[in-house]
Amino acid sequence: MQILLANPRGFCAGVDRAISIVENALAIYGAPIYVRHEVVHNRYVVDSLRERGAIFIEQISEVPDGAILIFSAHGVSQAVRNEAKSRDLTVFDATCPLVTKVHMEVARSSRRGEEAILIGHAGHPEVEGTMGQYSNPEGGMYLVESPEDVWKITVKDENNLSFMTQTTLSVDDTSEVIDALRSRFPKIVGPRKDDICYATTNRQEAVRALAEQADVVLVVGSKNSSNSNRLAELAQRMGKTAYLIDDANDIQEAWVQNAACVGVTAGASAPDVLVQNVITRLKALGGSDAHELTGREENIVFEVPKELRIDAREVQ
């Protein structure tokens, strides 16, 4: 059984930055450090940080006065940000800069009095945070997930519309929704640069190449990870059996016993240690040494907040 690895896979710059912010805060200030929502959607990462003293909460009211609070990589609404400001808290923002870019687009539309349409998944924390950047009572903010949704919404002024997208969507699905938006609202204005982030796009491109060669595709990522789910769905759309797994323990021998080639990739919030454990498990089931496919090189780095960088050097 051949083992193929997608390239690129695993951590993106935004996830690296978010985890570093929590780790640095723990190293500098000591436990406990409060984090609003899971800092990234990966069970292994969250459990590891929890063991070191991170406390994950959903409501600002759960954070005691004087504590340190970190916003997750998914971003928060202005209401949440304002609530935190009203408290005696030290706040660090781990929002991915590429999510912040979308926040700025929404805020700009709100200031201009444009109505805004967000393409995204209802209930996802990134969507909640992005929708929460719109505050113009004279306008409106709408959420759509599919081309069908586009034809159901009612706007006030079809000539003063803009759209944005969640950063972790399926590139193909989003393209269909954008086509529907442009068809229904010919004057709608989109972002100058795609909102779907480079890491999401690159990992979907990589899983396409992987699925062309593999009989079975294993996607390492947690069930609540949007970008990981999109990778599994893409492989399935290409006619391949695909499984979303948290770790190597999820792999069932029956999944791969008749496979000549098993492909492995990982969502943007899944650490490489989990991929290595999957390779070890597959080898135990008869797999050969893993071979990595060629793919796009990623050199993007997002710095942690200045305060944490300075404090981190002092600690060292």
Curated annotation (Swiss-Prot):
Classification via Gene3D superfamilies: 3.40.50.11270, 4-hydroxy-3-methylbut-2-enyl diphosphate reductase, catalytic domain (3.40.1010.20)
Q: Where does (2E)-4-hydroxy-3-methylbut-2-enyl diphosphate bind?
A: H41, H74, H124, T167, S225, S226, N227, S269
Record pathway: Isoprenoid biosynthesis; dimethylallyl diphosphate biosynthesis; dimethylallyl diphosphate from (2E)-4-hydroxy-3-methylbutenyl diphosphate: step 1/1; Isoprenoid biosynthesis; isopentenyl diphosphate biosynthesis via DXP pathway; isopentenyl diphosphate from 1-deoxy-D-xylulose 5-phosphate: step 6/6
- Binding-site positions, dimethylallyl diphosphate: H41, H74, H124, S225, S226, N227, S269
Keyword Iron assigned = yes
What keywords is this UniProt entry annotated with? 4Fe-4S, Iron, Iron-sulfur, Isoprene biosynthesis, Metal-binding, Oxidoreductase
Q: Where does [4Fe-4S] cluster bind?
A: C12, C96, C197
- Segments crossing the lipid bilayer: none
Coiled coil, from the record: none
Q: What does the entry give for GO biological process?
A: dimethylallyl diphosphate biosynthetic process; isopentenyl diphosphate biosynthetic process, methylerythritol 4-phosphate pathway; terpenoid biosynthetic process
Residues annotated as signal peptide: none
Q: Which cofactors are required for activity? A: [4Fe-4S] cluster
Which reaction(s) does the protein catalyse, per the Swiss-Prot or TrEMBL entry?
A: isopentenyl diphosphate + 2 oxidized [2Fe-2S]-[ferredoxin] + H2O = (2E)-4-hydroxy-3-methylbut-2-enyl diphosphate + 2 reduced [2Fe-2S]-[ferredoxin] + 2 H(+); dimethylallyl diphosphate + 2 oxidized [2Fe-2S]-[ferredoxin] + H2O = (2E)-4-hydroxy-3-methylbut-2-enyl diphosphate + 2 reduced [2Fe-2S]-[ferredoxin] + 2 H(+)
Report the protein's function: Catalyzes the conversion of 1-hydroxy-2-methyl-2-(E)-butenyl 4-diphosphate (HMBPP) into a mixture of isopentenyl diphosphate (IPP) and dimethylallyl diphosphate (DMAPP). Acts in the terminal step of the DOXP/MEP pathway for isoprenoid precursor biosynthesis.
Family of the protein in this entry: Belongs to the IspH family.
Q: HAMAP family, from UniProt?
A: IspH
Under the heading NCBIfam families, the entry gives: ispH_lytB, PRK01045.1-2, PRK01045.1-4
| Protein's name according to its UniProt entry | 4-hydroxy-3-methylbut-2-enyl diphosphate reductase
As recorded in Swiss-Prot or TrEMBL, the protein's gene is named ispH
